[in-house]
Amino acid sequence: MCERSLYRAGYVGSLLNLQSPDSFYFSNLRPNGGQLAALPPISYPRGALPWATTPASCAPAQPAGATAFGSFSQPYLAGSGPLGLQPLGAKDRPEEQAKFYTPDVAAGPEERGRSRPPFAPESSLVPGTAGLKSTKYDYAGVGRAAPGSAALLEGTPCAAGFKDDAKGPLNLNMTVQAAGVASCLRPSLPDGLPWGAAPGRARKKRKPYTKQQIAELENEFLLNEFINRQKRKELSNRLNLSDQQVKIWFQNRRMKKKRVVLREQALALY
């Protein structure tokens, strides 16, 4: 502990009714801060006052590398050396000290002084990029086709028109006629078939039942809702209908009767 002595100059001077050095320092100053012209200026530095000095025993110990307030610290240099994570007192264990090295520290001083050459692409990549650029903008190569594809185009009837167009200069803004494209895309149909009907998927046109056929079928349905194969064959021969038509008509008639019964039951509940 540091104890201030009672025999210091400032304390003894106050007991003996002596003027304090502050009076010499502030006596020639006006209240507004200006000095009187009649009195000479007295410079009494604060550092020379006896009570302003602190004994060495009371002063805190400062490290040798510490700087005073207001002074500038050393600027950071990227290649100055490794930075340690341990405090200053841990210099006795340099092998355990974790260090961070900047990229310039690992290299030698002569290597750091050399200027790095600018990046240049490899020569092997340059021809590839040139080839890509040439193929990207080479519109004249669109008209040229492979030998195999040319042989395939010769067999189709509309391939001749494409080959004639490919011989001339290629126009990117040209519009192809829709009729010509549709004629080449859809297969050629034989004469006599309607447009849109496939050759092997021909479907019979629906033939409605006549009033006489419907009356005969209704009379048979009133007698028996389910008919056997023999009765169905007799009806088909008599009404000039196929066996499948008679079978489907009875199925549809039973479903119609079922819907009517369900509707009547629903109305009876309300």
UniProtKB/Swiss-Prot annotation:
Q: Name one GO cellular component term.
A: nucleus
User: Could you name the domain of life of the organism this protein comes from?
Assistant: Eukaryota
Instruction: Note down the stretches annotated as region Disordered.
Output: 103-127
The UniProt GO MF terms for this protein read: DNA-binding transcription factor activity, RNA polymerase II-specific; sequence-specific double-stranded DNA binding
Q: Which residues bind DNA?
A: 202-261
The record's keywords, sorted A to Z, are: Developmental protein, DNA-binding, Homeobox, Nucleus, Transcription, Transcription regulation
Give compartment(s): Nucleus
- Which PROSITE patterns does the entry link to? HOMEOBOX_1, HOMEOBOX_2
Q: Which InterPro entries does its entry note?
A: HD, HD_metazoa, Homeobox_CS, Homeodomain-like_sf
Instruction: Look up the signal peptide feature and give its range.
Output: none
Q: Which PANTHER family match?
A: HOMEOBOX PROTEIN HOX-D12, HOMEOBOX PROTEIN HOX-D12-RELATED
Its family remark reads: Belongs to the Abd-B homeobox family.
Task: Report the function annotation for this chain.
Answer: Sequence-specific transcription factor which is part of a developmental regulatory system that provides cells with specific positional identities on the anterior-posterior axis.
The name this protein goes by in its record:
Homeobox protein Hox-D12
- Tell me the organism: Carollia perspicillata (Seba's short-tailed bat)
Q: Which gene encodes it?
A: HOXD12
